[in-house]
Amino acid sequence: MANERTLSIIKPDAVAKNVIGEIESRFEKAGLKIVAAKMLQLSQAQAEGFYAEHKERPFFGDLVGFMTSGPVIVQVLEGENAIAANRDLMGATNPKEAAAGTIRADFAQSIDANAVHGSDSPESAEREIAYFFGNEEICAR
């Protein structure tokens, strides 16, 4: 088992519902530590840059519009197999398919407004963390 870091974003829909603490509590109860966190209002350029891999997909414009519609919480989670653990906690991308008790089943509205983002691989985690955080902003715990 590897100690890993992953990026988590609490998306505008979940921030608007005021469930930030409930979501973060789930991370901590699962053994993940929050080692960096900040609230941001993403600009269009920031959202487009972060989701650049989806630029040619038909949903790109809607995704960027949604991610800039309100503040988000970006955070780095650390722990044993953090990437897989976070993805298990989040549940399926489509909340209608998400298992009961997952973040998306409990807090998401739709496949677009699905409450949270999490890195899907070690390579994505490294790139996504570096997109939002400098090394000096990540605190060992």
From Swiss-Prot:
InterPro entries: NDK-like_dom (IPR034907), NDK-like_dom_sf (IPR036850), Nucleoside_diP_kinase (IPR001564), Nucleoside_diP_kinase_AS (IPR023005). One of its GO terms (molecular function) is nucleoside diphosphate kinase activity. Its cofactor is Mg(2+). GO terms for cellular component: cytoplasm. It is an enzyme of class 2 (transferase). ATP binds at K11, F59, R87, T93, R104, N114. CDD domains: NDPk_I. The active site is at H117. SUPFAM superfamilies: Nucleoside diphosphate kinase, NDK (SSF54919). Pfam families: NDK. It is found in: Cytoplasm. The keyword Electron transport does not apply. Keywords: ATP-binding, Cytoplasm, Kinase, Magnesium, Metal-binding, Nucleotide metabolism, Nucleotide-binding, Phosphoprotein, Transferase. Its main location: cytoplasm. Major role in the synthesis of nucleoside triphosphates other than ATP. The ATP gamma phosphate is transferred to the NDP beta phosphate via a ping-pong mechanism, using a phosphorylated active-site intermediate. This is Nucleoside diphosphate kinase. It comes from Chromohalobacter salexigens (strain ATCC BAA-138 / DSM 3043 / CIP 106854 / NCIMB 13768 / 1H11). The gene is ndk.
